[in-house]
């Protein structure tokens, strides 16, 4: 089975195949269905899925918002339309993943220095 982040990368390459049309709202519905299916099948949450749960808070900080709107609605608000919002999501997602990678790398470095 492919990882959660690999799935998002596949969606980015061929959004119409997975979403029907290029739309951030369709992406949200797809991801909600994916999450629901995994829960129904009692598949444990992966590290990437757990990490993605922080995306909402990260988006709020990125746009300097403390809002009750979903990340989907926030990105859509700052976009021209659904298609533009989807493209913007993938840019933000890449930034989110890279930020987390550097944060994780820093934590590992700190642990190795402390352990010496």
Question: Locations of the language-model features?
Answer:
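Short alpha-helix boundary/capping elements
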Residues: 32-39, 59-68, 82-83, 101
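Residue-level detector of well-ordered alpha-helical segments, enriched
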Residues: 3, 7, 26, 51, ...
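Amphipathic alpha-helical binding modules
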Residues: 68-116
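Short, charged/polar micro-motifs that form catalytic or ligand-binding hotspots
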Residues: 13-24, 45, 75-83
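Short terminal alpha-helical segments
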Residues: 1-36
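Short, solvent-exposed secondary-structure capping/transition elements
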Residues: 20, 24, 39-47, 68, ...
């Amino acid at each position: 089975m492919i990882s959660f982040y690999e799935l998002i990368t596949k969606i980015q390459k061929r959004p119409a195949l997975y979403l029907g049309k290029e739309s951030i709202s369709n992406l949200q519905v797809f991801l909600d269905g994916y999450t629901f299916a995994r829960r129904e099948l009692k598949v444990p949450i992966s590290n990437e899925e757990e990490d993605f749960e922080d995306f909402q808070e990260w988006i709020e900080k990125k746009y300097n918002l403390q809002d009750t709107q979903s990340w989907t609605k926030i990105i859509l608000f700052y976009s021209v339309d659904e298609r533009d919002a989807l493209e913007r999501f993938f840019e933000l997602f890449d930034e989110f993943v890279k930020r987390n990678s550097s944060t994780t790398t820093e934590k590992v470095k700190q642990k190795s220095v402390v352990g010496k």
